UniProtKB/Swiss-Prot annotation:
This is Pyridoxine/pyridoxamine 5'-phosphate oxidase. GO terms for biological process: pyridoxine biosynthetic process. Binds 1 FMN per subunit. The keyword Oxidoreductase applies. Its cofactor is FMN. Homodimer.
Length: 206
């Protein structure tokens, strides 16, 4: 996609954020080298100190943006404590960015179970073996845990650990950014006062 194609077309005419996000994500899937669903996830600890890391978006709809993790990890404990988070998608191939922030809820057990069973066997075993975000004495200790859980679940299905599930970020703001010449970028932000309220669209200075 050429620079001219990237910066033509007025996406700022859109009046609803989820449809626009779906369009941009679809285009990113065609242009990004890998992981077009990779997103920076920001959380804060009890002192207000932020943490950020990359996760993979696994689902989204009008209700929000879903990813899965170990609830005993740093991000898991911070989200369960604060009930808020932010995300930032950056697609370099498209020169586009989407930022969002909002309230967070835990997905249903049915949703988590369904997604968990789609994961490779090694990933399901890893969810049991890894005490995510806690000190690890050696690589051997991790590999030993993997071997132990592999043997335990050699026959039959691998159940989802109680500490492993998904979060849904229900955005209160979603901002779309597109690169422009001379740093004169295009930015629009969709805002709502509360969940369930209508969106208000604001064009922003770059």
């Amino acid at each position: 996609m050429s620079q001219n194609e990237l910066t033509t077309g007025d996406f700022t005419d859109e009046h609803e954020p989820f449809g626009l996000f779906e369009t941009w994500l679809t285009e990113a899937k065609a242009s990004e080298i890998n992981d077009p669903n990779a997103v920076a996830l920001a959380t804060v600890d009890e002192s207000g100190l932020p943490n950020v890391r990359m996760v993979l978006l696994k689902d989204f709809d009008q209700n929000g943006f879903v990813f899965y993790t170990n609830f005993e990890s740093q991000k898991g404990t911070e989200i369960l404590s604060q009930k808020k988070a932010a995300m930032c998608f950056h697609w370099k191939s498209l020169r586009r960015q989407v930022r969002l922030r909002g309230e967070v809820e835990v997905v249903s057990d049915a949703e988590a179970d369904a997604y968990y069973q789609t994961r490779p066997i090694g990933s399901r075993i890893g969810a049991w073996a890894s005490k995510q975000s806690r000190p690890l004495e050696s690589r051997f200790a991790l590999e030993k845990a993997v071997a132990e859980y592999t043997a335990r679940y050699a026959l039959g299905s691998i159940p989802r650990p109680a500490h492993w599930s998904g979060f849904r970020i229900k955005p209160l703001t979603i901002e779309f950014w597109r690169d422009g010449k001379f740093r004169l970028h295009d930015r629009i932000e969709f805002r709502r006062e509360a969940l369930g309220q209508p969106w208000n669209k604001v064009r922003m200075y770059p």
